[in-house]
Amino acid sequence: MIRFAHVSVLNLENAMRGARNPLASWDKSDSFYDEQGNYVLGENDLNLAVRLAKAGSDHRKFIRQIFVSVDITAPLYWWKEFDTYKVGTVANSTSTMHKIHAKPITAEDFSVDHLTLESAKFFGLIIDYLESVRLEYMETKDKALWYELIQLLPSSYNQMRT
């Protein structure tokens, strides 16, 4: 399970204006803001953006001026793959370290949609055990139990990052 929320695309207007700087073709820009305040990319600007994007990295540098922000909730194993491909990104994540004990550990906290029936039953035992460790930690505040939670947490545990 991967969930996307709160998507924002920012600085499109400035990026398109910058894309027109080399030929001083600002007068050909046809993008505008609609009544709701949304930036609408005009046909001329879209055509320019597509041509520059296809022309190679030297010509598509305007794309690097477009910022995208999104909340992504995904399992830890997915984040390991994602981290391999990201460039020039900054992320703030929910803290497993600080919050793993703050709420009950349930199956809904994990992405396990490809388990066999047998594996799903075993996974239920893992969840039950982790929850029992969490409850004991909440009673005793024994740091060894906290480490046990962190170290036994399956990589299918979902984490949100912005």
Predicted features along the sequence, with ranges:
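Family-specific signature for flavin-dependent thymidylate synthase
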Residues: 1-162
